[in-house]
Design a protein with these regions (language model features):
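Phosphate-binding chemistry for phosphorylated carbohydrates and sugar-nucleotides
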Residues: 2-190
């Protein structure tokens, strides 16, 4: 229960229960209008015991996990391992599950691109730099959605991070700060 409370706070960007309720109500209504199934390649191990199985359906999104019992491929969610998730989405689409539009493979430390999407014809993986760009864009947009008067937003990144982050930040009036390579350097800069 405590972890679910924490996750809702992180997703909503607010500890306020009423705000969280509003956000998750919007999500549920959107999922009712446009059904979505989220496909997850658990690839065995402890990932199969995550809160995703309970939490995602409670949010109005169908959850389709597979490879829950044993590790069947390398654990790093990079394109060569995400093909399994893409294959599963392709199978579901072929079987008539038109709501199977997104998939992922859990990434224990969150530093790899791990998203698969249906492009209307086949499932494709999203390159890591694009996943990060989408994350930056959605986080900044969400901050403005919560508070349209938000000012002084910033993003801390490694020096070699794609320049598309600069473009996104420029459009959303946020500053980019670059650190030397290394997660600790970025965290310290932030």
């Amino acid at each position: 229960a405590a972890y679910e409370k924490f996750i809702k706070t992180v997703i909503a960007g607010s500890p306020k229960i009423l705000f969280q309720h509003k956000l998750f109500s919007i999500l549920k209504k959107a999922a009712q209008k446009n059904p979505l199934s989220l496909v997850c390649d658990m690839n065995g191990s402890a990932r199969a015991t995550s809160i995703d199985k309970k939490f995602i359906p409670e949010s109005g999104i169908s959850f389709i996990p597979f490879n829950e019992d044993k590790i069947v491929h390398a654990i790093i969610p990079e394109p060569e391992n995400l093909v399994h998730c893409a294959q599963k989405i392709n199978e579901l689409q072929k079987e008539g599950n038109k709501s199977a539009l997104l998939g992922y493979m859990p990434d224990c430390d969150g530093d790899r691109g791990n998203i698969v999407y249906w492009n209307g014809k086949e499932a494709k993986t999203v390159p890591a730099q694009e996943v990060f760009a989408l994350c930056v864009m959605s986080e900044l947009a969400f901050e403005y959605w919560k508070n349209p008067d938000t000012k002084n937003l910033a993003v801390a990144v490694n020096c070699p991070t794609s320049m598309r982050i600069d473009e996104i930040c420029a459009r959303l009036n946020a500053k980019v700060f670059r650190a030397e390579v290394g997660e600790a350097n970025v965290v310290n800069l932030a």
